[in-house]
């Protein structure tokens, strides 16, 4: 009741009894001073953050911002023999079988004229009465240092508010209950017939991935496609 029920129902907008067990099991309970969220032996984030990592990965690749894929689908699909789609799978098929359910998140970010707010990168608020689910204090992901290793005199915090998704909102989390999973399986059957498209990620696979798991899945998909492409090339020789 104190640690899980209020937080889970606030985040998902549904009674705990309607959530799959893996959602509840994601919340670790320890009687120690270990403040890690995960139990993995090795944990970390990219130096400089994920934005820097993605920028390094893109390199000289052309990036188009503020471009609706569906408005330019024919043109964009013609640019490559394979398309990797990580948006909502139901949106790809224009919701022809109905809308899947998602949770959305709203952020309120503040710059505080103080060196420390909560002493930790993330603090979750488990009571149901606090409107936000957690507060992120970004500097602690880099141990409170700037790019030159100097202490930062100010701090930036973001409060996260969970809400029900509706068309026009940004979807964040799939609602993996029985009803939605059944609808996803129908969309998956349609997706499997799209030979040109690889569906991936939380939205493309309608799966509540952790970051390490989704990176591993992306690498696996890339390797599988590379092997398939090599096999097709060899067969055509």
Could you tell me what each predicted segment is?
Residues 205-222:
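A conserved FAD-binding loop/helix module that cradles the flavin
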Residues 7, 217-221, 234:
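Residues within well-formed alpha-helices
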Residues 193-206:
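Short FAD-binding loop at a beta-strand-to-alpha-helix junction that anchors the flavin cofactor
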Residues 52, 56, 186, 217-220:
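Alpha-helical elements of Rossmann-like donor-binding domains used by nucleotide-donor carbohydrate transfer enzymes
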Residues 1-82, 86, 91-93:
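Active-site/ligand-binding neighborhood in enzyme catalytic cores
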């Amino acid at each position: 009741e104190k640690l899980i029920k209020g937080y889970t129902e606030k985040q998902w907008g549904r009674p705990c009894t309607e959530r799959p067990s893996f959602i509840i099991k994601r919340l670790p309970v320890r009687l120690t001073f270990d403040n890690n969220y995960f139990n993995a032996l090795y944990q970390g984030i990219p130096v400089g953050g994920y934005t820097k990592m993605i920028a390094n990965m893109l390199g000289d690749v052309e990036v188009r911002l503020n471009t609706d894929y569906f408005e330019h689908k024919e043109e964009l699909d013609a640019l490559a023999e394979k398309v990797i789609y990580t948006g909502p799978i139901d949106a790809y098929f224009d919701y022809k079988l109905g809308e899947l359910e998602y949770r959305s998140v709203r952020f309120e970010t503040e710059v505080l004229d103080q060196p420390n707010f909560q002493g930790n990168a993330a603090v979750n608020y488990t009571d149901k009465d606090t409107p936000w689910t957690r507060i992120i204090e970004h500097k602690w992901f880099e141990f409170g240092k700037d790019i030159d290793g100097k202490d930062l005199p100010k701090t930036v915090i973001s409060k996260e508010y969970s809400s029900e998704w509706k068309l026009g909102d940004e979807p964040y989390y799939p609602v993996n209950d029985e009803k939605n999973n059944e609808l996803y399986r129908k969309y998956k059957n349609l997706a499997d017939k799209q030979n040109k498209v690889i569906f991936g990620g939380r939205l493309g696979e309608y799966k509540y991935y952790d970051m390490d798991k989704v990176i591993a899945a992306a690498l696996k998909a890339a390797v599988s496609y590379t092997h398939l492409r090599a096999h097709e090339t060899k067969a055509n020789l």
